[in-house]
Amino acid sequence: MNLIITCARSLESETKNEISKILDELGDQEPEILNVGMRGILMVNTIIEPSKIIDYVKNKMIEEPWLIRYCLRIIPIQMITETEIDKIKQNVIKLKDTIQKNDSHRITIEKRNTSISSNEIITEIAKIFPNKVSLNQPDWIILIEILGNETGISILKNDGMFSLDKAKRMSD
């Protein structure tokens, strides 16, 4: 899986249609789109590079803002692992070279259906990066998306995700 899509609860099928149409326009006629058993969340496996999807949707919001209605957030996922602190840390280490020595970062944890401690995860991941932390304007976001027993991990530029709310605020 390389994308997490969030939507309003009970609008999963409309969201599935919307993201299918977007992916079709980009050249993927057969993406795998799954309900993960949590309301308001879909996981997507597509052949399209996630950053290309984010750029496309952001441009669509400028050109035709009414076209994106159901995809509240589109979140690229670079790795998936089990929801265990050691495994999460091992996978973050595999991606760590994305962040250069002088770059700032922020660690963001989003948890659903788990009791794992955010503070423990942040403490372990922070040990990997000697870089400056910037909570407001980081160069990079180390994103840990926990969905029950599975965890998606990404290291993204600050503008590497799509948020419908942010896009609407920017256009006003």
Where are these regions (language model features)?
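SAM-dependent transferase fold signal centered on methyltransferase-like domains
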Residues: 1-172
